[in-house]
Amino acid sequence: MQGLMQDVPLTINHLFDRVERYHGHKEIITATAGGLERTTYAEFARRTRQLAGVLDTLGISADGRVATFAWNTARHLELYFAAPCTGRVLHTLNIRLFPEQLTYIVNHADDEVIFVDRSILALLAPLLHTFTNLKHLVLMDDGKGDIPDDLGGHALLDYEELIAAEEPIDFPEITDERRAASMCYTSGTTGNPKGVVYTHRSTFMHTAGAMMVDSLGVREADVILPVVPMFHANAWGLAHAAVATGATLVMPGADLSGPALANLIVDENVTVAAGVPTIWMAVLPELKGRDTSSLRSIPCGGSAVPRSLSEAYREQTGLPILQAWGMTETSPIASVCQLDVDQQELSIDEQADLRTQVGRISFGVEARVVEPGSTNPVSWDGEASGELQCRGNWIASDYYDDPRSRESFTDDGWLKTGDVATVDARGRIRLVDRTKDLIKSGGEWISSVELENEIMSHPKVAEAAVVGIVHPKWGEAALACVVRTDDSLTEEAVIAHLEGKIAKWQMPKGIVWIDEVPKTSVGKFSKKTLRDDHADLFMNQ
């Protein structure tokens, strides 16, 4: 027997229609070099429809790729909807990729137009002559930045002039919910980045997921500050969820410094502020003594959240960090560490320990932790570890035009995340490490993440990254690369701090002091850089 329910395509157009119809009075605030710019969703909707006309006038193909090289701004939000709502594909370019990687992804995706912020045009200009399919270059003036003389032969069109020349148009009907809506390439830490193509359906479902109370719980009453870039994994879905619900949006623009973000949180009464751990390390001291009572959630992902950082926020603001997990291939939210109701009655220390997990897998997503090289599940005892795999309504099924897809997906359709994890009796997941970052020393496995968390709990440590490098006795050994807040901190003091917290064989065999932990294009620790920099350290001792 078949059901008798309507089957309406799940499209991004529905999100746009709701904010246009119901929430036109709500605000979008953008921080610029010249101060705050305020607009409404009504104005956003009108301009987005004008921008749709711009794409037609420029002759962008019916399913053409519309690239952005931009910060989090109201203009970028207009592009987030104008492209997919007209059937085209938004391609957000990660501004922190290496030049050769940018050339690769622009050409691989066949981008026809790039919309670029003036403040970062100089980063893109030297590469313009390498883009083989690019037809148009459009400047979005965010208040500062020189305009290079050499633009690879491309005329520089002005965003505002293009908008002003168009009347708002109706969007075409999107009848196929599986039509491509946007694409984002992975950070490419090994080899060329891989393209993930999101559909209207997957984006709709992920947006609904972000609105669930056991996820991020985005709602109309929220004031959302997405510090996580719109050029990376859909800004964790916050831009779409804000539009769907009519939540106020606070866009940080180019200035992601601790003081600037703290001012936005306090001055705009932000309720949800989302970013990677390094962002929250910089913001914390800037919030000291200030009114942060508006905050209800601080989602954090991209890398493991140190227990000490989450607890520092709880002690200072009354609100611990909300750890979430995902990746470009998962749209990206796949789990959120909300505590169960009975766990909220546990001691402060016990709750803090639980918050170092990434939580239970999100509704709409399935997960399994399997033994290496098999589909055999590990025990749900919180101890046995294996590879975390997932599948679901907003999980990638393949990479765009890439033969490497077979390496990342199982024969039965699950995504191999590359994360090593444990799962407890309640299905709560703890990430042990990335597969490539586990350290095998003297035949025993060492989790670099666990070591980092313990080292970063020392009050004189700002950041710490642990890598495995070749050792003459142990084959491989842990090296801790540490950023101190106080130069009086010694190697002996760090080792003493670790005693009793980890086993002796897990101790780092060396500590090096560094000024800053190198980061990848998405703000994660670049352990490959550290391994390369210190590859022979133990062999030369």
Q: PLM features: what roles do these ranges have?
A:
Residues M1-L58, A62, T86, G143-K144, ...:
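N-lobe entry segment of adenylate-forming
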Residues L15, T57-L58, C85-A164, N269, ...:
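Structural core segment of the AMP-binding/adenylate-forming
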Residues I28-T73, L77-F81, F98-T103, A155-E161:
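Conserved AMP-binding/adenylate-forming core of the ANL superfamily
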Residues L55-I60, E166-R179, M183-L225, G237, ...:
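Conserved adenylate-forming
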Residues T68, L97, T103, I114-V116, ...:
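AMP-binding/adenylate-forming catalytic core of the ANL superfamily
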Residues W71, V116-P126, G143, V228, ...:
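Adenylate-forming
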Residues F204-V223, A233-T271, E286:
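Conserved AMP-binding/adenylation subdomain of ANL enzymes
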Residues I298, V305-A324, T328-I429, R434-L438, ...:
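Conserved AMP-binding/adenylate-forming
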